[in-house]
């Protein structure tokens, strides 16, 4: 099989979202064989494949080195599994020799050839293994802002600074709901009752299931729309580009940009590190604490490594409201953009809502056992 590490690896090591990653490539032979089995089974195998995407992946793909993978299988420390498609981009003038990448739970992971592994694109901090992060004085070296070409390159690398919540179409919500173990069990019970000529019971179960699915889909869609409206935000920000002040949409902010904060109230659209002036900030959206907090510039100390946890007083978090900013001497209130989009503190909260930790319900296991027992009884009864 070759070097095992080239076929699998670990990402986000030491973090709560640490995952083991496996590489897979499409196998024509396996795919044809699976489709033949699907036809012979009358399509019943589709349910199993939708419940467990990793099974479909293994039945249609072969294990391969991560560098050559078309899809990747991710296994978390909480026994969750995700199947993601690896995107192989075409080269451009700004991004020649682009490496492959994929998205998992709204986060981008890119292949780094020099270390032969995928790593998370999170912001200014270098996330490669062995990196010691950014020293605090580095933020002052960025005080003049980015060049337009550099900003455009980073925009293609990091993506737009937006937190977009998709509202799924109704038909997708219905399919996701009815393919769940509970409704499959209900369907199985209805079929058995129809076979035994208990039509009244079967019709009642069907009607109740339709009402239940409709109510669930309506509530899910309502909550998705409410979340989308709550997190969507955009404003016009003054940014330093090529040493000049220009007005840009907050969606165009990239890590390394220098933003100039106004004196009046404004909502932060990114995580940023304050390098000049003071700010009074309302962080109730993140912490629930109603008392305003004063933010001060980060120290210009090369021996200190920046950490959002340690340097909270120097960090302006996305989603928080700046009530008032006060310039120092003749300088404007400036901050260096540290993280954007779903990598921000606000983005992490939204991701926790969109992708909660899965719960292994004992009820589902019991449902499968019940279906198996009923299948045996029906088979015995028919014979």
Model-derived segments and spans:
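Extended, hydrophilic extramembrane loops/domains of integral membrane proteins
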Residues: 2-9, 141-162, 325-357
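Hydrophobic alpha-helical segments characteristic of transmembrane helices
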Residues: 6-61, 162-234, 238, 353-383
């Amino acid at each position: 099989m070759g070097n095992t590490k080239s076929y699998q690896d670990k990402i986000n090591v030491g973090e709560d979202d640490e995952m083991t990653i496996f590489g897979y490539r499409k196998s024509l032979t396996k795919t044809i064989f699976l489709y033949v089995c699907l036809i012979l089974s009358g399509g019943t195998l589709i349910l199993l494949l939708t419940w467990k995407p990793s099974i479909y992946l293994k039945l249609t793909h072969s294990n391969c080195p991560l560098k050559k993978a078309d899809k990747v299988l991710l296994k978390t420390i909480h026994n969750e599994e995700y199947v993601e498609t690896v995107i192989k981009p075409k080269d451009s003038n700004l991004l020649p020799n682009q490496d492959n990448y994929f998205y998992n739970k709204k986060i981008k992971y890119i292949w780094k050839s020099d270390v032969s592994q995928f790593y998370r694109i999170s912001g200014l901090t270098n996330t490669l293994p062995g990196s010691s992060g950014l020293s605090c004085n580095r933020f002052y070296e960025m005080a003049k802002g980015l060049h337009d070409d550099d900003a455009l390159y980073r925009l293609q690398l990091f993506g737009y600074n937006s937190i977009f919540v998709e509202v799924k179409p109704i038909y997708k919500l219905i399919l996701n709901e009815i393919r769940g173990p509970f409704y499959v069990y209900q369907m199985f019970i209805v079929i058995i009752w129809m076979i035994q000529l208990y039509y009244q019971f079967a019709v009642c179960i069907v009607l109740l299931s339709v009402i239940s699915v409709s109510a669930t889909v309506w509530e899910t869609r309502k909550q998705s729309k409410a979340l989308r409206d709550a997190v969507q935000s955009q404003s016009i920000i003054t940014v330093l580009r090529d040493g000049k002040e220009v007005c840009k949409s907050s969606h165009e902010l990239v890590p390394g940009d220098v933003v100039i904060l106004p004196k009046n109230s404004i909502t932060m659209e990114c995580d940023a590190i304050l390098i000049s002036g003071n700010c009074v900030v309302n962080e109730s959206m993140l912490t629930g604490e109603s008392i305003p907090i004063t933010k001060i510039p980060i120290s210009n100390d090369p021996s200190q490594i920046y950490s959002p946890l340690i340097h909270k007083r120097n960090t302006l978090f996305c989603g928080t409201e700046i009530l008032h900013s006060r310039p120092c001497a003749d300088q404007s209130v400036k901050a260096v953009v540290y993280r954007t989009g779903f990598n921000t503190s606000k983005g992490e909260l939204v991701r926790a809502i969109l992708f909660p930790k899965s719960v292994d319900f004992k009820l589902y296991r019991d449902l499968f056992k019940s279906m198996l027992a009923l299948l045996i009884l029906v088979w015995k009864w028919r014979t």
